[in-house]
Amino acid sequence: MALPSQEVSRTRNFCIIAHIDHGKSTLADRLLEVTHTLDRTQMSSAQVLDDMDLEKERGITIKSHAVQMKFKAEDGQEYILNLIDTPGHVDFSYEVSRSLAACEGALLIVDATQGVEAQTIANLYLAIEAGLEIIPVMNKIDLPSSDVEGVASQIIDLIGVERDEILQVSAKAGTGIDKLMDAIIARIPSPKDNKHLPLRALIFDSVFDPYRGAVVYLRIVDGVLNKGDRVRFFANDHIYTADEIGTMSLKRQPKETLASGNVGYLICSIKDVKDAKVGDTVTHADTPASEPLSGYKDVKPMVYSGLYPVNSNEFEDLRESLEKLSLNDASLVYTPETSVALGFGFRCGFLGLLHMEIIQERLEREYGVNIITTVPNVEYRVILTNSDVIEVDNPSKMPDTTKINHVEEPYVSMQIITLSEYIGNIMKLGMERRGEYKNTDYLDSSRVIMHFEFPLGEIVFDFHDKLKSISKGYASMDYEYIGYRESDLVKLDVLLNGEPVDALSIIVHRSKAYEWGRKLCQKLKGIIPKQMYEVAIQAAIGSRVISRETISAMRKNVLAKCYGGDISRKRKLLEKQKEGKKRMKQVGRVEVPQEAFLAILNIDE
């Protein structure tokens, strides 16, 4: 049984877009409360939609969530409101774009104390591209530091709305929520009623249930989906039976039918979330739609890093933990690898730096695995002299320099929003990181948007931390991938007594190789403990050593018992000691402590 058309006209699908910490999840809580989806007593925790501890702690939403609310409006009609919560961070921008595609409208939340930030703008542009109706909302108006008029003029400049169209709320105190509910119903259009067309549903998220397999969250765009239907996924052509379908209040509510305009879930015995790709289209297996919904793409990892257990006998635990994590995170890619220095581990691919930090933190916190992380790096494209192209995500896979024609690296276009007084500092940081400055736009008299193009490899490190510290926390950034460009890159090896330590190798720009090599050798000299023999730490490009530090040997004073006497006696003892040290050096292996691998991560400190 399909939904009657009037129910489609009383449906509103919307999402909330905001920068980190601008109060998005708190506002979602107030909406749940005002629609009686939850009452205050059930709100044992603030931010109901942020399930993971990490989401609450970092104040970010990592996964997209969906929740259905019912609201009786002033006209006496009951409306169905589907709120699709989107991740706000730059690493998850593809997930955001798919969540937006499942909506007709968006609430643009701007913190009245902070103003418009970089990720607000990035996600706003995605919403405008998706053709959504935007309702600007100013949050935290009750705080003494809020600048309501200043922020309102920024919003007006940004999206060209009238001043009275900007709603003012305090999500924490619950001020202005009623007006917001009226605006959602009045200003966001209802979905198109396309029940008569062949089924097409957009997947915007999936979660793993240990008993039911992957639970797919989808928005029905065209047609009707009934329980028991045979469905086909466009991306991989797999066919399943819809065992259970329904809508999401805070718990799953099974239904017999989902029709055009609805947001709900589908359970069909999918073993792996990787088979339910975000952005894919679901259609009927027997009467399929002729083409999928537009916008699907396979998300590729941008940042790679090696994860190794501190204790080599925890390798299996690490494997199991990664398997469990990847059940819920289709964008995590990992393959086993071995390192001479670190033993067995995994090479993992992440969407970006925040994604990498979250995975590492979850491994340590939820699964109790202690890990060593190698330097994060990006995927380089190496064009060989015989015109073959290979992709290198690990410095140890870099071919010999004689075989390389040239190397290309990924570039990103970046927007940085900051106060105008920090422009000089940010320009300096941009130049240090091989950035290409494009232009600056003024948001208002004191805030600017600066546009740069950067090699991704230069910002995966500590760029965000540096940006925050030179702007006293005022700058925010957002970037998007723009393609590969040719660069003069070299592989820098670290040798201990002539033996390369593969886990310390990195790929750097030739102009920075000497400085990096010198700093690294100095840092390692302070970390590697003294041995019974002399240890040479060298940084080399190919066979050419560009920097060297020496750790002197621990030695016993063999002359302590010689009082006076012949010089040749003393020389004989010294020669004997020297000979022994030489023999030790031939058979001895320098143990590299764990801190040495972390030293690269904070080489400037």
Curated annotation (Swiss-Prot):
Pfam families, per the entry: EFG_C, GTP_EFTU, GTP_EFTU_D2, LepA_C
Q: Which domain of life is it from?
A: Bacteria
Q: Name one GO biological process term.
A: positive regulation of translation
Reply yes or no: does the keyword Cell inner membrane apply.
Answer: yes
EC number(s) per entry: 3.6.5.n1
Per UniProt, what is one GO molecular function of this protein? translation elongation factor activity
User: What do the Gene Ontology cellular component annotations say?
Assistant: plasma membrane
**Localisation:** Cell inner membrane
The catalysed reaction is:
GTP + H2O = GDP + phosphate + H(+)
PANTHER family tied to this protein: TRANSLATION FACTOR GUF1 HOMOLOG, CHLOROPLASTIC, TRANSLATION FACTOR GUF1-RELATED
UniProt similarity note: Belongs to the TRAFAC class translation factor GTPase superfamily. Classic translation factor GTPase family. LepA subfamily.
The name this protein carries in UniProt is Elongation factor 4
